[in-house]
Each structure stands twice: as C-alpha cells, then as structure tokens.
UniProtKB/Swiss-Prot annotation:
This is U15-barytoxin-Tl1b. The presence of a 'disulfide through disulfide knot' structurally defines this protein as a knottin. It is found in: Secreted. Ion channel inhibitor. GO terms for molecular function: ion channel regulator activity; toxin activity. Disulfide bonds join C54-C72, C65-C78, C69-C119, C71-C90. GO terms for cellular component: extracellular region.
C-alpha cells in the first residue's frame, strides 16, 4: 500500500511539473519577441528623425547642388555622381547597417559643420 501511494504521488508530481524543454522553448520565444519589439525603439533613440529647419535659400532633399552647405539638414550632403561633370543632389547617405548609419550621420554632421565655415567665407 505504501509503495502504491509513493508511485501515485511520484506520478502526480511528475505530471504537475512542466518539462524543462517546454519552459526553455517558451522562454526563448518570449526573449526573441522582446528583442524584436525593442529593436525599433533602440533605433529610434539612437537615431532620431532628422528635422530640418531650413534657412531661406537652402535646398530641399532631391534638389541640385554643388556643395554640402547648400543642402537643408544637419546631415544632408550634396551627393555627387561618379562623373564630376554632372551636378549633385541634396540627400542623406544611407546604409542598411544600424552602426554604419550612425557613423555616416556623425561624419556627415561634422562635414557639414566644417563646410558651413568655408561656405560662409
């Protein structure tokens, strides 16, 4: 009788506990969902939207330009084509890599700051 009670209690205990594999699977799914949900928020904090407050005479995105200081925006650059005979256009250099995009934004901002000094002269 005691053996029967021990077996029943063991069986009930084993059934009541979820398996370790099921817990790990659920935990991995939740962790993946959390990471997917957090990625856009991280990107939004790291690279806020570029809000351009333009001075009269500055060119909007897509307009033809010759120098970076002509374009409206902190990181807007005059993107030139491979041949120098064609004029460039105002825009933002982009890359699909988040880190690379941050580096481009930083480099373009510094470049625009320096070119603004030379354009003013």
């Amino acid at each position: 009788m005691k053996l029967f009670m021990v077996l029943v209690a063991s069986f009930a205990f084993a059934v009541a506990l979820p398996s370790k594999k099921r817990e790990e699977t659920a935990e991995n799914e939740l962790t993946g969902d959390l990471q997917e949900a957090a990625q856009p928020m991280i990107y939004a904090v790291a690279f806020p939207e570029i809000r351009a407050s333009c001075v009269i005479g500055w060119k909007q995105q897509g307009a033809k330009c010759e120098r970076d200081c002509e374009c409206c925006g902190v990181a807007a650059t005059c993107i030139t084509r491979s041949t120098n005979s064609l004029p460039g256009f105002c825009g933002y250099r982009q890359t699909p890599n988040v880190l690379g995009q941050g580096l481009l934004y930083t480099a373009d901002t510094i470049s625009n700051g320096l070119s603004a000094i030379f354009c003013a002269a």
